From Swiss-Prot:
Assembly behavior: Homodimer.
Alphabetic keyword roster: Manganese, Metal-binding, Oxidoreductase
Cofactor: Mn(2+)
Source organism phylogeny: Bacteria, Bacillati, Bacillota, Bacilli, Bacillales
Annotated cofactor note: Binds 1 Mn(2+) ion per subunit.
Top-level division of the source organism's lineage: Bacteria
This protein's name: Superoxide dismutase [Mn]
GO cellular component: cytoplasm
Catalytic reaction list: 2 superoxide + 2 H(+) = H2O2 + O2
GO MF terms held by the record: metal ion binding; superoxide dismutase activity
InterPro entries: Mn/Fe_SOD, Mn/Fe_SOD_BS, Mn/Fe_SOD_C, Mn/Fe_SOD_N, Mn/Fe_SOD_N_sf, SOD_C_sf
Residues the entry annotates as binding Mn(2+): 27, 82, 164, 168
Organism field: Listeria ivanovii
EC numbers for this chain: 1.15.1.1
Length: 202
């Protein structure tokens, strides 16, 4: 298997005016692409690894040879994280979750607005580069953040929603205004896909 960029289900400018075309194009064709390239380089010569989906590699880092484990953690994580991120977005996004995910959020966090507040705080508080996540852990929802391209999958948690807070994800449009970028994220979330992912993760 050769790892490849996932096909985006929308054009680079489809999320305007929320997320700008230039950032989306650079983020996808440059940043995500280099993770895919470097992951393929890392597993080259390891046929037993190259046959596994990226998420499976990241979820089982202990099974990766030590000499390439760091590269798989970084670049496999970057590939898995960004693949989920793109699927989290939609030009017809926004609003709120429905169904089982809505019920689980309200059960765990109180209201949707209270959940948003806690998620925003996790994203804003991540020092330097990283991610904020809504994950399923032992059947329950949690909000966590990870550094760099570390994935919740490596901790046995299943990500449902992820927000990239590396500066490359927002700096061209928002400069140093990370909280504004975080607030804008809610306008483009594809809740239909998040609902499906939650149902599959339970």
């Amino acid at each position: 298997m050769t790892y490849e960029l996932p096909k985006l289900p929308y054009t680079y400018d489809a999320l305007e005016p929320n997320f700008d075309k230039e950032t989306m194009e650079i983020h996808y064709t440059k940043h995500h692409n280099i993770y895919v390239t470097k992951l393929n380089e890392a597993v080259s010569g390891h046929a037993e690894l190259a046959s596994k989906p990226g998420e499976e590699l990241v979820a089982n880092l202990d099974s990766v040879p030590e000499e390439i484990r760091g590269a798989v953690r970084n670049h496999g994580g970057g590939h898995a994280n960004h693949t989920l991120f793109w699927s989290s977005l939609s030009p017809n996004g926004g609003g709120a979750p429905t169904g089982n995910l809505k019920a689980a959020i309200e059960s765990e966090f109180g209201t949707f607005d209270e959940f948003k507040e806690k998620f925003n705080a996790a994203a804003a508080a991540r020092f330097g580069s990283g991610w904020a996540w809504l994950v399923v852990n032992n059947g329950k929802l949690e909000i966590v953040s990870t550094a760099n391209q570390d994935s919740p999958l490596s901790e046995g948690k299943t990500p449902v929603l992820g927000l990239d807070v590396w500066e490359h994800a927002y700096y061209l449009k928002f400069q140093n205004r990370r909280p504004e970028y975080i607030d804008t994220f809610w306008n483009v979330i594809n809740w239909d896909e998040r609902n499906k992912r939650f149902d599959a993760a339970k």
